[in-house]
């Protein structure tokens, strides 16, 4: 997913030869960095490099044959250690400007419980939930009673993973324990959330910062393979889901969801870009589901589709994100800090 997103971003930016010289960097699952000739999966011709903290260079070949001074980094990376504040913190340590949310917003956005708490404080409706911790253990009977009280189904989700990894729909209380055990394979904390009958999944994209935020048209994703938008429907089954942009919802409802998307993004202290996901019931009531602070960026991803529906040019959005990254870095550099 990260590779597909990065390929699109690299292609669009590489077409702007008067503005950018693009250096694609591949990071392996082992954490090793490689400079690529063309953005894509790992290739034998990729050059091993290492990030360094120097005034004259940020990236140096392991054989010493070359070095690069990066003006800005576009961390088109998804998942653990990528969009959860880890990479952002590393780039802060290198003192390199980078696109997207900072350490705090990235970390909070990746945590489903923290982002729900922030959404609630921002006045955005959320669904009831419980947290299960691997370390603390859990009272299965109490959780089953809570699930029955809320009304089945409930959804069990790892707290700090993507929207589809490790997720199970629990239709009976007898299924709850196996769903918890499954999710706890992927994270130390698990969210048990009340389900929504006949839920529609509505999305809104955001870019900018502070008072200069733009929200996209709302889009809807319908699952073709399976009962909900799980990992199988998202990545495995061809045509497992269908996207409709703009979503077929009343204009006033779409406007309210856009406003709530902006409210969550601002409350999270977001900067750069994000996609905010909602669940809507059959009566038109909607609830915040999660925020993705580095959404998919490929041509078929929701982020470019949602802004394209508003007449926004993808290349200009990328230009704006890079310019914002430079402004944010300059603003931090101007602060009086005791280092």
Explain the meaning of each model-derived region.
Residues 4-7, 11, 67, 108-199, ...:
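Active-site nucleotide/adenylate-binding loops and adjacent lid/helix of ATP-dependent enzymes
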Residues 248-339:
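ATP-dependent carboxylate activation and anion-phosphoryl transfer catalytic cores
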Residues 89-98, 174-177, 309-311:
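A glycine- and small-aliphatic-rich helix-loop capping segment at beta-alpha/alpha-beta transitions
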Residues 171-259, 280-287:
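Phosphate-binding site of ATP-dependent enzymes
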Residues 1-104, 108-110, 114, 132-145, ...:
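ATP-binding N-terminal substructure of ATP-dependent carboxylate-amine bond-forming enzymes
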Residues 17-20, 196, 266-273:
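Surface-exposed helix-capping loop/turn segments at secondary-structure junctions
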Residues 22, 97-98, 126, 154, ...:
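Hydrophobic beta-strand scaffold residues
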